[in-house]
């Protein structure tokens, strides 16, 4: 009996040691942009540009990490002067995300309970030329368009991984709901 217990403990230890290394998930918050999210790995910040026919050219702030060949990305765009056009801007961004891709899921998204509820959209697409699979979530809140994208790259290939869903569903706009000890996301300089 003792040998079986020792053998089981050794086997369990070896299984843990041979498992692929994955970064720990952390809670991040941006007080200035008004959201919190959970992501694995080291988050990098950059700026980018976006152009839509309705929205026009926009500067974007992008928070990105990659872990286990899954790319996690939050993109924030300001539309403070165009809040009356929020439905059109949101719809345009959703359309551009899924355009010319095979749509696997398209459903409404909701975060925050009760009177704090914010509605948006969740879409999963298969990328062209076996480029992987991306799940996106889109929310327009207080004059900002928030886009979350989790792309399972072909090198990972585990399209049933729960990690993209964990990331997409972790966003919160009521900052008191962020985990205690969340790391402040740095804005680009």
Regions found by a protein language model. Give the residues of each.
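Bacterial N-terminal signal peptides that target proteins for export
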Residues: 1-10
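Sec/Tat signal peptide C-region and signal peptidase I cleavage site
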Residues: 18-23
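Short acidic/polar N-terminal linker immediately downstream of export determinants
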Residues: 24-32, 50-53, 180-183
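A structural detector for beta-sheet-dominated domains
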Residues: 31, 38-40, 46, 64-66, ...
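Surface-exposed amphipathic alpha-helical segments
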Residues: 31, 43, 88-104, 144-189
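Signature of long, low-cysteine stretches enriched in small and polar/charged residues
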Residues: 38-62, 94-141
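A short, polar/proline- and glycine-enriched secondary-structure boundary/capping micro-motif
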Residues: 48-50, 83-88, 114, 158-162
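A short acidic-to-branched-hydrophobic micro-motif
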Residues: 61-91, 147-149
